[in-house]
Amino acid sequence: MAKTSMVAKQQKKQKFAVREYTRCERCGRPHSVYRKFKLCRICFRELAYKGQIPGVRKASW
């Protein structure tokens, strides 16, 4: 889990738009966040395996 102070700091409006970054809405992780789902890769994988993300299936070819 992310530090509470870092999550609070990120939620405030930044002075410059360049400083804004995505953060996982579930755990607060700042890296490897899928914008479409607003989830990090770890949370995305957990929820996808449980079938809680509609339209997402495990690939097989």
Curated annotation (Swiss-Prot):
Superkingdom in the source lineage: Bacteria
Gene Ontology biological process: translation
Residues annotated for Zn(2+) binding in this entry: C24, C27, C40, C43
UniProt xrefs under PROSITE patterns: RIBOSOMAL_S14 (PS00527)
Cofactor requirement: Zn(2+)
Keyword Repeat: no
One of the Pfam families matching this protein, by short name: Ribosomal_S14
Cofactor binding note from Swiss-Prot or TrEMBL: Binds 1 zinc ion per subunit.
Gene Ontology terms, MF aspect: rRNA binding; structural constituent of ribosome; zinc ion binding
Keywords carried by this UniProt record: Metal-binding, Ribonucleoprotein, Ribosomal protein, RNA-binding, rRNA-binding, Zinc
Record keyword Transferase present: no
GO cellular component: small ribosomal subunit
Protein family per UniProt: Belongs to the universal ribosomal protein uS14 family. Zinc-binding uS14 subfamily.
Entry-linked HAMAP family: Ribosomal_uS14_2_B (MF_01364_B)
Function: Binds 16S rRNA, required for the assembly of 30S particles and may also be responsible for determining the conformation of the 16S rRNA at the A site.
Subunit annotation: Part of the 30S ribosomal subunit. Contacts proteins S3 and S10.
Protein name per Swiss-Prot or TrEMBL: Small ribosomal subunit protein uS14B
Organism whose genome encodes this protein: Staphylococcus epidermidis (strain ATCC 35984 / DSM 28319 / BCRC 17069 / CCUG 31568 / BM 3577 / RP62A)
